[in-house]
Regions:
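Conserved nucleotide-sugar phosphate-binding/catalytic loop shared by glycosyltransferases and other
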Residues: 2-9, 28-78
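Structural detector of well-ordered beta-strand residues that form the stable sheet scaffold
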Residues: 6, 36, 98-99, 121, ...
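Short amphipathic alpha-helix
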Residues: 15-27
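Alpha-helix C-terminal capping segments
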Residues: 25-27, 92, 108-119, 138-139
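Active-site-proximal region of nucleotide-activated glycan assembly enzymes
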Residues: 33, 44, 55, 114-145
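An aromatic- and histidine-rich active-site surface loop
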Residues: 43-47, 97-116
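An amphipathic, basic-hydrophobic alpha-helix
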Residues: 64-97, 115
Length: 145
């Protein structure tokens, strides 16, 4: 039976490239694994992942903090939409693991995985975790630093 892993994160290369490295390492270790990514259309992942040969499902998501009032409000509106999109994607893919890399793109997917009781790994690349990984680390099964 083929294992399926969904990796979420992006927006910047700091979240995305460690995820690509993880995906390639998993594929080297286990040839019978299918890796998919979830991100946004506006993030770097929309350009990089197709070139790297990975499937990308785009969702609506945006950062929640550090914005002007209207932009912040729109970000909160996108959160339930992105979560619903993520839930549909996860129900369709039925992964054995969801990996959150941090950044606003990982929030809806990891929350959906938690609601669907899919195992969650948070992958933190920095010495100080970002806000998304701090929040999501509380519901994750494992946190890798």
């Amino acid at each position: 039976m083929q294992k399926r892993v969904v990796i979420a994160g992006g927006g910047t290369g700091g979240h995305l490239y460690p995820g690509i490295a993880l995906a390639k390492a998993l594929m080297r270790h286990d040839m019978d694994i299918k890796i998919s990514f979830v991100g946004t259309q506006k993030g770097i992942e929309a350009k990089v992942l197709p070139r790297e040969g990975f499937e990308l499902k785009t969702i609506l998501s945006a950062g929640l903090l550090g914005k002007k009032r209207l932009s912040r409000w729109m970000s909160w509106v996108k959160l339930p939409i992105g979560t619903a999109q993520s839930m549909c994607f996860l129900i369709n893919k039925r992964p054995s693991l969801v990996v959150g890399l941090g950044g606003y793109a990982s929030g809806p997917l990891v929350l959906s995985a938690w609601l669907l009781r899919i195992p969650i790994l948070i992958h933190e690349q920095n010495s100080f975790p970002g806000l998304t990984n701090k929040w999501l680390g509380k519901i994750a099964d494992k946190v890798a630093v």
